[in-house]
Amino acid sequence: MDFDAQLIRFFGTADIDTLAPERLLEGVKLLQMQFGLERDSDRRFELWCLMYMLGVAPDPDPTFEDEADREAAHEFMAMADREIDEA
């Protein structure tokens, strides 16, 4: 997953700390819309991970039909939370 490329795609920059609140909200809305339209499971998972890192991801259990995707989402959440705790 190339999070920087996705940040640039949806927010116009990889450094979202520099964004005005309204631009951040606009990017989140675009990201959520793309997530809702996406049918490819790998791409959908990548978008979900980015939303999780931004604090706007939906609950993975009702979101992912495939058990493997749900498990991967929970593993990603645990990994990301560990890294945040260690920082």
Tell what function each PLM region has.
Residues 1-37, 41-87:
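Long, compositionally biased terminal regions
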